[in-house]
Amino acid sequence: MTAMDVEAPILCAQTTVIDARTVGESFIRLVVAGAELARWSAEVVDAGTVRDAYVKLIIPPPGGGGVVPDPAAIRDWLALPESERGWMRTYTVRRADTVVLDGAQVPALTIDMVVHPGDDEGPGSSWARSVAVGDELHIVGPGRGHAPWAAWAPGQAGRIVCAGDETAAPALLAIAEELAAEPSSAREISIVIEVPTEADVRALSDGAPEFVTLVARTAVAGEEVIRRLAGILDVGEESIGSVMGGQRPAADRDREWHPASEVSDGDPYVFLAGESGLIKAMRRLTVDAAGIAKGSVAFMGYWRRGAAES
């Protein structure tokens, strides 16, 4: 790659919604495409798996419109009223493809958006319910020649364990597809995802590799995925009760977010993603109860219950 091929580190691309459909009961799957995506990092937009790469969607205010941000002057954009500029929200890319749009071959990204009910519904969820094919959407992401915004780094780990909630489902399912495609992999792989309903389990299980387990939420959010994770890690029942009753993250920490250190060949690698309170509980289970070294654990707090995120 020459200097001429390297774009700015952060770019804002105009895209068009070319498909929008409901998946299960809790997800809306969007496919967006546009020529400007061709200037993005190859590890985000080139056809194939995308691991846990995430992008920033510019959610327009009610009635449409909004202000397109200049990545070089993002503070100016953030200073505008939300009712004028809209909102910036983070989503993981589920899949990258190419499609024909307006007679030209262009990149396309599939993004699964969780629609939270009631008080947990934010502007992204509300917008997703009303989006239509043909709508425009601006997306911010890394420019070509730059690394994707992602944390997945298992190295040559001999054992991989992943766990998360519905917001982690797109990343974990993309990761599962990448792992399943590895030639003659000798890794021991376990992935468990808690989703809101049985309908979500059925919809997301379709085509998922056999080492992926999807479970429906019980009355207590996070309880089922923690129980399944404890089983995978061979941790006793008393530890489950302990982490479920643990304190929430300290008030001055918006999210739990820590990539793993470099993983040595054959070591275990644990990847935890989802709501920050859940992540803290699963991290305690993994490190304190199961005794896995902190450097082998990546934990990504994608959101925090009751708090806005941009």
Where are these regions (language model features)?
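Extended, composition-driven regions rather than compact fold-specific motifs
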Residues: 1-310
